[in-house]
Regions:
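N-terminal type II signal-anchor transmembrane helix
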Residues: 2-30
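Intrinsically disordered, low-complexity segments enriched in polar/charged residues with Gly/Pro
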Residues: 8, 18-21, 63-66, 89, ...
């Protein structure tokens, strides 16, 4: 037993010595991706190419001695050049991968999401939008905080976001939508309009009810948010000419809902459509760009604007 302990201590000393054998003077952090299914030798080669270790054999031998060799995990890591072999092995063994935090705000369009991700060097905007447009996923990229590893593909990002939408959109929502005679796409489309129109949380259900009342009566929705989407106008004041733009998204010209969502709504806006306020209001307008004034009759609506 004493001999075994001595050998074990000796091996630990060797590991410590070798783990500090190659320490760069640079304190630089380096992002390195270990491909899925890589062997210990292949991992060592990647680390050597990035000048994080000085010798492949030393790395492989230490990984065998420590028992880490069969448990090293793939992924994207953030290594410091002065980490040393043992610390790198521990990170690979624990799977301490590096990821970027990305918060997608409620109401962002797919294009805005693509721009945000491109700024963080996580995707190519054009590739991202091609996938979104091909599968008509505007509205289904759920706004939330995500952690993405560098090197992730555009499709993987989209899959994560649409999967989150699937988790948030409960089965009971489908039953409620049927009661309102709405399809899922109708719900998401209307929720996206509510998301853009609402300035404060308390008004979401009131705004949703106005639009539902208008749909029921066969009126134009007359949502300025749909005009902005059609014109790709995010902030400039709209003109009367803008309200006449020929677009399937123009709810001043076309009856019913637009062809699809105009942004990616959050859960509160989706719930507002499915569980709207109890009201007969048919009109609303924003007062000083803040809260809204609601009315049942047109005359009352005009009077409040004076």
């Amino acid at each position: 037993m004493k001999i075994f302990n001595l050998i074990f201590i000796f091996l630990l000393v060797v590991i410590v010595i070798y783990s500090g054998y190659y320490l760069s003077r640079s304190n630089e952090n380096l992002i390195v991706t270990i491909p899925y299914g890589s062997t210990t030798k292949e991992i060592a080669k990647v680390l050597l190419e990035n000048k994080l270790i000085s010798n492949e054999s030393i790395f492989v031998n230490i990984s065998k001695i420590t028992g880490f060799s069969k448990k090293l995990q793939s992924g994207t890591y953030k290594f410091n050049r002065r980490s040393g072999t043992l610390k790198i092995l521990l990170m690979l063994w624990k799977g301490k991968t590096f990821s970027l935090k990305v918060t997608v705000p409620e109401g962002y369009t797919a294009e805005q999401i693509a721009e945000l991700l491109q700024e963080k060097k996580l995707c190519d905007k054009e590739k991202f939008m091609k996938l979104v447009d091909k599968n008509r996923l505007e509205g289904y990229l759920f706004p939330d905080t995500y952690f993405f590893s560098p090197g992730i593909s555009e499709q993987e990002i989209i899959d994560r976001m649409t999967a989150e939408f699937g988790r948030q959109y409960l089965s009971e929502f489908n039953n409620k939508a049927k009661e309102l005679r709405l399809t899922k796409n109708d719900v998401v489309s209307l929720a996206s309009i509510v998301e853009k129109e609402a300035k404060i949380e308390e008004e979401r259900k009131l705004i949703a009810r106005v639009f539902l009342n208008r749909l029921k009566k066969g009126w134009h929705l007359e949502s300025c948010a749909t005009i902005r989407y059609a014109l790709k106008n995010s902030g400039k004041p709209l003109t009367y000419k803008d309200l006449k733009v020929k677009s399937p998204y123009n709810t001043y010209r076309n009856y019913g809902l637009p062809p699809g969502p105009i942004c990616n709504p959050g859960l509160l806006s989706i719930k507002a459509v499915l569980y709207p306020a109890d009201s007969d209001n048919m009109f609303f307008f924003t007062k000083n760009g803040g809260t809204h004034q609601f009315s049942k009759y047109y005359d009352e609506h005009i009077k409040k604007q004076r």
